[in-house]
Swiss-Prot record:
Gene Ontology molecular-function annotations: ATP binding; metal ion binding; succinate-CoA ligase (ADP-forming) activity
Sequence ranges assigned to domain ATP-grasp in this UniProt record: 9-217
Reactions that this protein is recorded to catalyse: sulfoacetate + ATP + CoA = sulfoacetyl-CoA + ADP + phosphate
Name of the protein described by the UniProt record: ADP-forming sulfoacetate-CoA ligase subunit SqwK
Keyword ATP-binding among record annotations: yes
Keywords: ATP-binding, Carbohydrate metabolism, Ligase, Magnesium, Metal-binding, Nucleotide-binding
GO biological process, one term: succinyl-CoA metabolic process
Cofactor(s) listed in the protein's UniProt record: Mg(2+)
Taxonomic lineage of the native organism: Bacteria, Bacillati, Mycoplasmatota, Mollicutes, Acholeplasmatales
Record's keyword annotation contains DNA-binding: no
Function, in words: Part of a variant of the sulfo-TK pathway, a D-sulfoquinovose degradation pathway that produces sulfoacetate. Hydrolyzes sulfoacetyl-coenzyme A (sulfoacetyl-CoA) to produce sulfoacetate and CoA coupled with the phosphorylation of ADP to generate ATP. Cannot use succinate, acetate or 3-hydroxypropionate, and shows only residual activities with malonate and 3-sulfopropanoate.
pH profile: Optimum pH is 7.5.
Binding site for Mg(2+): 185, 187
Length: 401
């Protein structure tokens, strides 16, 4: 679970990490107190997606009229947004990047820092990897003071700022541990002309498996971008909604991201990302119900069952179709344990399961584009839709492919 910036900065302040003077504006505020932090100030949209600066969601304002205009504008262009953060402007000398995240391969945490803050760390890692400093953290002992000093001394700060940096790093680790975080990030950490350090932005991502231990951040339906996203969260189903045409139901993160890339490679667009493999493989009915809440043109189901048996997933898909009567085409490609039984179940339900992921993707893209001339029953033997559609129509209507 990702926290909003204002939530992250509240946590920072509680752990003695300096943040700019600020005020939180609610959407329903009819007379927002935009003057309370002074001018110039920065109006910042509180959304969970990245790239706010590039999208015009962070604006510098110099007076009350500009501030009121930006408040109104940002709420209009982000209608689902509930909050805005207005912060005092900071006199910046340099920007630093710092974070602590999970390093799964080593079973440790890792402290990452760079003098070149204010940019995406992924871009920096590709273009200038030499500017990034990493320090592994053994979770048995936590972040040790000599490790924090080792990082701080390489940031080329003043003596006073270096002392502050050491303490900030130690405090970030305390947050990381206390809140079961996968990531705690400050980007940028401002080194100011007044010889101080201030967190310019903040991210905290809490491990989804530990959210129940963090009741202060419990989210309600209004915190989600859509009803589908909220229901997926309640079910523990990984879900992201986009603006494309093809709804994805896939087993596992790796397969889902691969299919996502294949769809774009074939010229299609994705309406949603949804995983129903692993512990969720028996939730096919709920997964399809969530997918049907998304305005897509086609649902593409791709699975590879190992521990999650293919026939059990197929049973769930068939049950979902019977119960929900989908109003759009469905393309299936199920492989893995008990695959033969899964194929028979899908055929009995009027579906035409495919056996190749790339072919399934191409079929879904064609259907999304309105090319209904062909549906591929196998890789080798494409047949005209009209020949297969009679059986499908009798069972579930004309839109199951």
């Amino acid at each position: 679970m990702k926290l909003y910036e204002y939530q992250a900065k509240t946590v920072f302040s509680e752990h003695k990490i300096p943040t700019p003077k600020s005020i939180l504006i609610q959407k329903e505020d009819t007379n927002p107190e935009v003057k309370s932090v002074g001018f110039p100030s920065v109006v910042k949209a509180q959304v969970l997606s990245g790239g706010r600066g590039k999208r015009g969601l962070i604006q510098l304002v110099k007076n009350e009229n500009e501030a009121l205009y930006q408040v109104k504008r940002l709420f209009e262009i982000e209608p689902s947004m509930k909050h805005l953060l207005i912060e005092e402007a900071v006199h910046i000398d340099k920007e630093i990047y710092v974070s602590i995240t999970v390093d799964a391969p080593s079973g440790k945490a890792i402290l990452i820092a760079s003098e070149s803050g204010g940019v995406e760390i992924e871009t920096l890692a590709v273009e200038h990897p030499e500017l990034i400093i990493k320090e592994p953290i053994d979770l048995r002992y936590g972040l040790l003071s000599h490790q924090a000093r080792h990082i701080a001394y390489q940031m080329n700060l003043s003596v006073n700022q270096t002392k502050q940096m050491i303490q900030i790093l130690m405090n970030i680790y305390e947050i990381f541990k206390k809140y079961d975080a996968e990531l705690v990030e400050i980007n940028p950490l401002f080194a100011t002309k007044e010889d101080t350090l201030i967190a310019g932005d903040g991210k905290i991502m809490i491990d989804d498996n530990s959210v129940f231990r963090q009741p202060r951040f419990a989210q309600t339906e209004t915190d989600y971008s859509s009803e589908a996203a909220y229901e997926a969260s309640l079910e523990g189903i990984p879900f992201i909604q986009f603006d494309g045409d093809i709804g994805l139901m896939c087993a596992g993160a790796g397969l889902t991201t691969t299919v996502y890339d294949l769809i774009h490679y074939e010229g299609g667009t994705v309406a949603n990302y949804l995983e129903f493999g692993g512990p969720n493989y028996k939730k096919a009915v709920k997964a399809m119900e969530i997918c049907l809440k998304v305005p897509s043109k086609v649902i593409l189901i791709v699975t590879f069952g190992t521990i999650a048996r293919a026939d059990v997933m197929a049973e769930g898909i068939v049950e979902a179709i019977k119960k929900l009567n989908p109003d759009r085409p469905i393309v299936t490609c199920i492989r893995g344990t008990n695959e033969a039984h899964a194929v028979e179940l899908l055929k009995e339900a009027g579906l035409t399961p495919l056996f190749d992921t790339e072919e399934a993707v191409r079929t879904a893209v064609r259907l999304a584009k309105g090319e209904k001339r062909w549906v591929f029953l196998s890789i080798e033997k494409p047949k005209c839709v009209s020949k297969a559609s009679r059986v499908v129509k009798e069972a579930f209507g004309p839109n199951i492919w």
